Design a protein with these regions (language model features):
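Conserved hydrolase catalytic core segment
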Residues: 99-138
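Conserved alpha/beta-hydrolase "acid-adjacent" motif
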Residues: 207-213
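Catalytic histidine neighborhood in serine/cysteine hydrolases
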Residues: 218-235
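Catalytic histidine-centered segment of alpha/beta-hydrolase-like enzymes
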Residues: 232-245
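Conserved acidic catalytic loop of the alpha/beta-hydrolase fold
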Residues: 83-101
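Conserved HGGG/HGGXW glycine-rich cap/lid loop of the alpha/beta-hydrolase fold
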Residues: 18, 23-72
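Hydrophobic, aromatic-rich cap/lid helix
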Residues: 160-189
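Short beta-strand/loop motif that positions the catalytic acidic residue
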Residues: 193-194, 200-202, 206
Length: 262
């Protein structure tokens, strides 16, 4: 066990020889509420998820791991590929005794959630993809970097020191190589194999995830739907947590959409 952030507590779990840090909510959720696992984006670790974790904690048990190599988790000498990060996420979920959960990813975390739903469907009840990357129409480092620069103008200032600190902690080599792995991941090919209810959430001001790409993601998911949060940037998990929590609660309380062929 470890330090606390108001309403959240730290824990470390050994997975594949690595100590994995996670934050979890300390409130007792309503009986029967599904656990939600928050999967962070590129480099920023679970610290970026704290506002959303606090917003969801009264209704659900929240778990927010730092993927190996990021945040307070142990850093392996090699940079893990997306498939390896996904395997670690699955192993961590089992090690925590979570038989089945809702997985909510942000940005590159969405790519891991999609991989998990395809490779380990027994663990996944529903998925929420908030700002899913990488748009195949802009799958180069130059294009994505320009989109990230544009997005930084719309993000709340409190995210900047968190992001810079976490980027420094994970190191430039790990950050750039993970970025490269994400660029090489054809998420669009995996989406039709996600066989659980799926919610895609986009901020209307998000230049990283265009409206066209968000619609394509939802259309490719057999049980997918799209919600757009007005004037929201890319990182809704940090900058619009109350609005995002509201649409997540609505999604989880609604009956599953009928599966369609895609």
């Amino acid at each position: 066990m470890g330090r606390r952030t108001a309403g959240l507590k730290s824990t470390w779990t050994e997975v594949g020889g690595l100590r994995v840090h996670a934050r979890f909510s300390t409130q007792t959720p309503p009986e029967g509420a599904s656990p939600i696992i928050l999967v962070h984006g590129l480099g920023v670790a679970s610290r970026s998820m704290v506002p959303l974790a606090k917003a969801l904690a009264p209704s659900y048990r929240i778990h927010a791991p730092d993927l190996p190599g990021f945040g307070d988790s142990e850093k392996p000498p090699q940079v893990l590929a997306l498939a390896e990060l996904t395997a670690c996420l699955a192993a961590w979920t089992r090690a925590c005794g979570l038989e089945r959960a809702v997985f909510l990813g942000n940005s590159v975390g969405c790519q891991l959630v999609v991989r998990l739903a395809v490779r380990h469907p027994e663990l996944v009840e529903r998925v929420v993809l908030q700002g899913p990357t990488m748009d195949p129409g802009a799958r180069t480092m130059r294009q994505q970097t320009w989109r990230w620069i544009r997005n930084s103008r719309g993000e709340r200032g409190s995210l900047t020191p968190i992001a810079l600190r976490e980027y420094w902690r994970c190191g430039l080599r790990r950050l750039l190589k993970t970025f490269r792995y994400a660029l090489e991941d054809p998420i669009e090919e995996k989406l039709p194999r996600v066989r659980v209810p799926a919610l895609v959430v986009r901020g209307s001001w998000d230049p990283i995830v265009t409206q066209r790409w968000a619609e394509e993601v939802a259309d490719r998911l057999p049980m997918g739907r799209l919600v757009v949060i007005r004037d929201g940037p890319h990182t809704l998990i940090h900058n619009r947590p109350l609005d995002l929590a509201r649409v997540v609660r609505e999604f989880l309380s609604a009956a599953p959409a009928k599966r369609r062929d895609v």
